[in-house]
């Protein structure tokens, strides 16, 4: 039995398109702005959390929208980037490697940059045996 593939888009909560991005899974409006089967992960950094704690009104509104959407739909997932990078293994820390995103289930947090990417492989088949 085959399982449908899935993909996730990670976007920083402070990105200019964040509010529009929150709506891409809604089956309404312009179909060219919809992506009903794409999963979402909101990347939240320490800088944003400090703004939120300080009572920054714009941050509070954005955070509220995120939580309302999550309550209504179960998404987006939330990656706390600062906490993730604080928990990086020593090899990452000693080489200044940072995690910027995660996979759909959030169990894979690998360094990514212009030269490095990662993929979540749920299973594989070694065809060399056959």
Question: What residue ranges belong to the model's regions?
Answer:
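Active-site cavity-forming subdomains of large catalytic enzyme subunits
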Residues: 1-129
